[in-house]
């Protein structure tokens, strides 16, 4: 069966580095880190006091105020980012067949802060007093549902709950506390040393929030309407470590196999890849295993390609990580700029690739990879190709 070519024609994001693609990408190019003190709740009794929060987000800029009140924060992020992406793609949805327009938006946890608030309300006033919007605001698939409703998209609508593309907001006492208890978060109080992927002094990730949306379009359709094309999606791989519920398989075996699957699907040789937007969380196991996986797949070429983790600037956006990093990878190919891994100061002998420490690179590459590796052993890898027009 002949594969139809798929291109990226629109981008949208809300994340700790900015509330639009232009604002965020400019900050990433400057190497600005979005990590800072948690402002959403009192951290006096919390070990972890830093997070990568979205700043100055006004849902009313893109969402009707009455509708926004019925949405959890993660859904607001998704709808705002989707509105930007569709506008960026210059799509006139009234001229499209809505049954041919799908909506796929992930969330790792959904409306966790709403769960906390309504649980406390239920305990204090009785559970019959919780908000009638509690369930629809909380469930993880509501980001995709609300985007489909807003734009009248009647094709497949789904929400894969893995380390995939979508929206997330779980900077809350319960969310941060849960990750703290499992020793996944870096407890430092220094924002410049908190999210430091591949650094020998890394001590866990920094929780973040946001959304990243990409408009994917069949090439012929995009060309027929004269759409701007950021990059082409040429391959995809997905598998499972089936090893441990939080730890990666030894040596990054599952992640390596996932990259091989994606390259095979793309019909691309490893030596053709010039950049990897790594999962790069800043935990000891993830970064060393991902580095080992890259070496296993690329051999000596691993030392020639550029690898970076934009989580050094955004923190770990959980279910939104893949979407936001997909936006950055598409822009890296489109603009010929590979973002840095900021705040990487102390080399780790186990992590000895070119992670573009503290300075990005003006470099045009033909192929780039974006990796996402999630709890439960979920692995996903997308291969992007530079669009030459």
Model segments located where?
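ACP-dependent fatty acid/polyketide chain-elongation machinery
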Residues: 1-67, 220-232, 327-342, 385-389
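Flexible, low-complexity linker/loop segments at domain and module junctions
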Residues: 1-8, 97, 266-272, 302-303, ...
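Condensing-enzyme catalytic core mediating Claisen C-C bond formation in acyl metabolism
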Residues: 5-9, 33-37, 190-266, 275, ...
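Conserved beta-ketoacyl condensing-enzyme motif
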Residues: 8, 21-25, 29-165, 169-176, ...
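A glycine- and small-aliphatic-rich helix-loop capping segment at beta-alpha/alpha-beta transitions
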Residues: 22-27, 113-127, 177-189, 250-251, ...
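Active-site-proximal alpha-helical scaffold in enzymes
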Residues: 78-91, 140-168, 206-227, 316-338, ...
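Short pre-catalytic strand/loop immediately N-terminal to key active-site residues, enriched for Gly-Thr
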Residues: 130-135, 155-162, 199-203, 305-316, ...
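Acyl-CoA/ACP chain-elongation machinery
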Residues: 168-203, 236-250, 278-287, 304-354
């Amino acid at each position: 069966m002949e594969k139809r070519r798929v291109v990226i024609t629109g981008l949208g994001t809300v994340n700790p580095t900015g509330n639009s693609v232009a604002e965020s990408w400019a900050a990433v190019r400057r190497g600005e880190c979005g990590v800072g003190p948690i402002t959403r709740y009192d951290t006096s009794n919390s070990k972890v006091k830093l997070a990568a929060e979205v700043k100055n987000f006004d849902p009313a800029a893109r969402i009707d105020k009455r509708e926004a009140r019925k949405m959890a924060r993660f859904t607001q992020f998704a709808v705002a980012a989707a509105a930007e992406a569709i506008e960026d793609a210059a799509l006139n949805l009234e001229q499209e067949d809505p049954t041919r327009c799908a909506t796929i938006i992930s969330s790792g946890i959904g409306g966790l802060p709403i769960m906390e608030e309504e649980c406390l309300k239920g305990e204090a006033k009785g559970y019959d007093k919780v908000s009638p919007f509690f369930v629809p605001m909380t469930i993880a698939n509501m980001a995709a549902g609300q985007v489909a409703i807003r734009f009248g998209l009647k094709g497949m609508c789904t929400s894969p709950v893995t380390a995939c593309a979508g929206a997330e907001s779980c900077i809350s006492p319960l969310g941060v506390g849960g990750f703290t208890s499992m020793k996944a978060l870096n407890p430092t109080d220094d924002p410049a040393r908190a999210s430091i992927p591949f650094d020998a002094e890394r001590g866990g990730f920094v929780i973040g929030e946001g959304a990243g949306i990409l408009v994917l379009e069949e090439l012929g359709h995009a060309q027929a309407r004269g759409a701007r094309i950021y990059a082409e999606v040429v391959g995809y791989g997905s598998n499972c470590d089936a090893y441990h519920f939080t730890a990666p398989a030894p040596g990054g075996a599952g992640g390596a196999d996932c990259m091989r699957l994606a390259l095979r699907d793309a019909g691309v040789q490893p030596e053709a890849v010039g950049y990897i937007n790594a999962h790069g969380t800043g935990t000891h196991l993830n970064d060393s295993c991902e580095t080992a996986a890259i070496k296993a797949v690329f051999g000596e070429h691993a030392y020639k390609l550029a690898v970076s983790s934009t989580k050094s600037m955004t923190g770990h956006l959980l279910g939104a990580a893949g979407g936001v990093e997909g936006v950055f990878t598409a822009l890296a190919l489109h603009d010929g700029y590979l973002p840095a891994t900021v705040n990487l100061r102390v080399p780790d002998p186990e992590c000895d690739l070119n992670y573009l420490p503290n300075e990005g690179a003006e470099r045009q590459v033909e192929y780039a990879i974006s990796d996402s590796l999630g709890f439960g052993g979920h692995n996903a890898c997308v291969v992007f190709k530079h669009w030459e027009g």
